[in-house]
Amino acid sequence: MKPVSELFNNRAGGNATMWSISPDDTVFDAIKVLAERGVGALIVMKDGKLAGILSERDYTRKVALLGKNSKETYVRDIMTANVMVISPKTRTLECMAIMSEKNIRHLPVVDGDTVVGMLSIRDLMNDIIKDHEFTISQLESYIKG
């Protein structure tokens, strides 16, 4: 399996796009960003450093189901602060194992002290599909001679 950095290089535009918010933002503002960007989680940054992650699950479980007001609740109050991170060199198979074991769908990618991207389960699934399509194509070519 390939390193995460290779997945980012294969993305449209060849980058590791990520969206971030501040712990001082309201949950309502965070949910707007999630919806506008079509992503399931945001990196939470404070003073240029990783402070946590906010996911749709955090919102659902810690705001919506508890009847809290998203315009009066702050990201810092519901974010996951103790975040599992990976490096750009982490292999995709290891990422799948981490996601499965921890029951998570997003992993911030950190190079040294710098957050360089966010890996999602969607990224991993798209990569598996692409690899399988390539394998099928190769097998078909071999069979046809």
Regions found by a protein language model. Give the residues of each.
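Tandem CBS (Cystathionine beta-synthase) repeat/Bateman regulatory domains
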Residues: M1-G145
